[in-house]
């Protein structure tokens, strides 16, 4: 895109903060207002679990990660799922707010570099949406985020690597243990040849219990992936 065209588009559609939607100066390329930048609930300021990255009172692995088998090699998120970060994630689920993905991916990519800087990734994949959601929205926010994140990290995005199989309830309506049962066997890999022997970065919007990320990682690894790390925009508290 030419500089003149970019200026014209910015004039017609002024950038908005990805977190509070306030209008920003036309020349501002990172779409976060000064107030949100200061008040966002960053994870990096917290003591965190060494595996799932959730804020924890002490260092090392949290109890939840210790008590289960983990298929991801690690999970990271730039924000705690609350306040302005939560508002941004909820808004990002709607197609009209897909523009937020460009800015949110900046924070995700930065956190991936911070926590997994020594990892040599081969590519990026995304958690597939529930079929019922795709029928309603025709929009996949995890794919949108993954594409932007891959671009920022200089990695290849592998589209449509996974798909949902069978029926699955909405995770947010279930208890902690029920979420793991709900997703068990709920995903399959379409193209094992694309991921065989590869170290992958798996992207989703939110990490709550980690059930979806761990199940996707299990399926990816059993289909030939060498190692799977995961990243989301935000994570809930333990």
Question: What is each stretch, according to the model?
Answer:
Residues 1-238:
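Glycine-rich phosphate/pyrophosphate-handling loop used in enzymes and phosphotransfer proteins
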């Amino acid at each position: 895109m030419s500089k003149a065209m970019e200026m014209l588009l910015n004039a017609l559609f002024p950038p908005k903060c990805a977190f509070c939607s306030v209008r920003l100066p036309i020349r501002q390329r990172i779409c976060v207002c000064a107030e949100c930048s200061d008040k966002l609930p960053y994870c990096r300021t917290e003591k965190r679990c060494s595996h799932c990255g959730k804020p924890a009172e002490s260092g090392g692995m949290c109890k939840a990660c210790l008590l289960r088998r983990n298929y991801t090699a690690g999970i990271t998120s730039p924000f705690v799922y609350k306040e302005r970060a939560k508002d941004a994630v909820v808004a990002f689920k709607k197609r009209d707010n897909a523009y937020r993905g460009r800015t949110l991916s900046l924070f995700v990519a930065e956190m991936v570099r911070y926590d997994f800087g020594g990892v040599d990734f081969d590519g990026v994949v995304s958690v597939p949406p529930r079929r019922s959601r795709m029928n309603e929205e025709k929009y996949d926010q995890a794919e949108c985020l993954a594409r932007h994140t891959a671009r920022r990290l200089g990695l290849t995005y592998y589209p449509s690597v996974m798909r949902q199989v069978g029926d699955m309830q909405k995770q947010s309506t279930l208890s902690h243990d029920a979420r793991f049962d709900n997703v068990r066997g709920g995903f399959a890999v379409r193209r094992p040849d694309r991921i065989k022997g590869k170290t992958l970065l798996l992207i989703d919007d939110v990490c709550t219990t980690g059930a979806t990320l761990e199940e996707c990682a299990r399926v990816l690894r059993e289909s030939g992936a060498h190692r799977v790390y995961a990243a989301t925009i935000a994570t809930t508290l333990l």
